C-alpha cells in the first residue's frame, strides 16, 4: 500500500511513523510529506531513509492513504486534493471534526459508521478520545446523563515549541528571553487556558470535548462541561471525570465492563498506591482508569481518574487504528 504521512517532521507525525512500524501496517511505498521548508530533509521509516517531499509531489504519486497531522489550514486545503485522486485521508486536525459530511471516529467506539464513501475521516481531539473510550461502554449500559471533566494536559499536546519552552525554563532561561508557545511560563505552573477563548467563556478546547462527545456517541442529550488546563509534564494527559447516570449502577460492574473493553487498563488498588499516572502512560496505547468511587452528592454518580499518552492513543495510534478499520473493511488495498 502506498502511504503518505503529511506533517511527518512534527511531534505527532514522527510518532505516526513509529506506530505504523510497530503495528506492521502494510506499507509498500512510503511518502513523507511536510511544508516547503522541510522538503529534502531525511526521515527514517522501517529501516530505510526517505527524503521529505512537497504535498504537490505526494498528490501526484496518488497514495492509497494519507495520514495528516499538519494543522487545520493545510488540512482544509490539501485533504480534498488528496481525496480527489482516490486517496483515503485520516486527518488529525480539528478542521473536519464537526463537518456533518465527515465521520469522527474512535475505532473502539464507533468504527461501524465508516463506509466506502468516506474519503476524509476526522481523528478526534486527544482529550475526547481518552475520555470516550471508558465512557462509551458505560453509556450503552447505564445511559450517561451528565459529564463534568477537568483535564491536566501535557505540554506535548501543544507541539515541539511548547516542549522547548518548558525545557528552556527548566534550564534557567528568563521569561521573555526565549521563544514561548504559551502566554505565561509553564514550568512549575498550571495554565487554565488551551486554545482561544470564546464569547461563552469557554475555550475552543473545552467546547471540542463537548461537541465531539455528542457527535461520536450520537447523542446530543448528554450534558457535558469541561475545564482544560496545561500542566508541565511530558508523559500524557490526565482527566478527572465525574459522571451522572440516568439509572442506578453497580461499581463492580463498571470495573468489569472496563476490564473487558479493549484499549482500557484498570489500575485501581489504592491499598497499594496503584492508580493511573501520566509518567507511566508514556509510550503506551491504552487508556488507564482508576480511583473509581461513587459520587455521594448525587443519586447515580461516579468519579474516576483517567490517563493516556496523548501523542499515541490521543493522536497517532487512533489515526492508524482508523486506517486499520478501513483496511479490514476492504476500503484500502492489502498490499
Give the predicted meaning of each segment:
Residues 66, 155-335:
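Charged docking surfaces used in two-component/phosphorelay signaling
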Residues 1-186, 221-223, 256, 287-288, ...:
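N-terminal Rossmann-like NAD(P) cofactor-binding subdomain of oxidoreductases
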Amino acid at each position: 500500500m502506498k502511504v503518505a504521512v503529511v506533517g511527518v517532521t512534527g511531534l505527532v507525525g514522527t510518532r505516526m511513523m513509529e506506530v505504523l512500524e510497530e503495528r506492521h501496517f502494510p506499507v509498500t511505498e512510503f511518502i513523507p510529506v511536510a511544508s516547503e521548508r522541510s522538503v529534502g530533509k531525511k526521515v527514517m521509516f522501517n529501516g530505510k531513509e526517505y527524503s521529505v517531499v512537497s504535498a504537490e509531489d505526494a498528490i501526484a504519486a496518488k497514495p492509497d492513504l494519507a495520514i495528516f497531522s499538519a494543522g487545520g489550514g493545510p488540512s482544509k486545503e490539501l485533504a480534498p486534493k488528496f481525496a480527489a485522486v482516490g486517496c483515503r485521508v485520516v486527518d488529525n486536525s480539528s478542521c473536519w471534526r464537526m463537518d456533518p459530511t465527515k465521520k469522527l471516529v474512535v475505532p473502539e467506539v464507533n468504527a461501524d459508521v465508516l463506509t466506502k464513501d468516506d474519503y476524509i475521516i476526522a481523528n478526534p481531539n486527544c482529550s475526547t478520545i481518552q475520555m470516550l473510550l471508558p465512557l462509551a461502554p458505560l453509556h450503552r449500559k447505564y445511559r450517561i446523563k451528565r459529564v463534568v471533566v477537568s483535564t491536566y494536559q501535557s505540554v506535548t499536546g501543544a507541539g515541539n515549541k511548547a516542549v522547548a519552552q518548558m525545557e528552556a525554563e527548566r534550564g534557567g532561561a528568563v521569561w521573555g528571553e526565549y521563544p514561548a508557545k504559551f502566554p505565561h511560563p509553564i514550568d512549575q505552573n498550571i495554565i487554565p487556558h488551551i486554545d482561544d477563548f470564546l464569547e461563552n467563556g469557554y475555550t475552543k478546547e473545552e467546547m471540542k470535548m463537548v461537541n465531539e462527545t455528542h457527535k461520536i456517541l450520537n447523542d446530543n442529550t448528554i450534558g457535558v462541561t469541561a475545564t482544560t488546563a496545561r500542566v508541565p509534564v511530558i508523559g500524557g494527559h490526565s482527566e478527572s471525570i465525574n459522571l451522572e447516570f440516568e439509572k442506578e449502577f453497580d461499581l463492580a460492574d463498571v470495573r468489569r465492563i472496563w476490564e473487558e473493553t479493549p484499549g482500557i487498563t484498570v489500575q485501581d488498588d489504592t491499598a497499594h498506591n496503584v492508580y493511573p499516572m501520566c509518567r507511566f502512560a508514556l509510550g503506551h496505547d491504552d487508556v488507564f482508569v482508576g480511583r473509581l468511587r461513587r459520587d455521594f452528592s448525587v443519586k447515580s454518580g461516579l468519579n474516576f481518574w483517567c490517563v493516556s499518552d496523548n501523542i499515541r492513543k490521543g493522536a497517532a495510534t487512533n489515526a492508524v487504528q482508523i486506517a486499520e478499520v478501513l483496511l479490514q473493511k476492504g476500503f484500502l488495498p492489502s498490499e
